[in-house]
Amino acid sequence: MLEEEIVKKLLEKQYTVTTAESCTGGLLAGRILNVPGASSVYNEGHITYSNEAKERLLGVSHETLVRYGAVSRQTAEEMARGAAKTAKAEIGLSTTGIAGPGGGTKEKPVGLIYVGCCICLLYTSKYGRWGCEKCDPGVARGV
């Protein structure tokens, strides 16, 4: 199962993960936490169904929510980034979408979901410490 592979990789790399969920309402966190060993890698989770909660708890910008909407790639990225920073985790995962049965539109139909992944790692070199942050669904494949 995917969640078992996620926990396995996190344990191998000694990374921590946190989640920020909207339409999944904690399902993602629950799936991860059902895997033995998850308590070593899972920091905390946020269920931020309202826009106000996304702004207050995760730092999603009001402008992003107005311009792109709560269900958007941009919001998913900001949710993942905010969750990782709040929890001081290396990885933030987020979900936002339209669960239904109502609320869908032609542009954003019921069932549309965006998954955000933000990887925040701190590297040390002879020049000092610096951070590298990537927010993109594709970065998860490299972990």
Mark where each language-model region is.
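Short alpha-helical segments enriched in small residues
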Residues: M1-V143
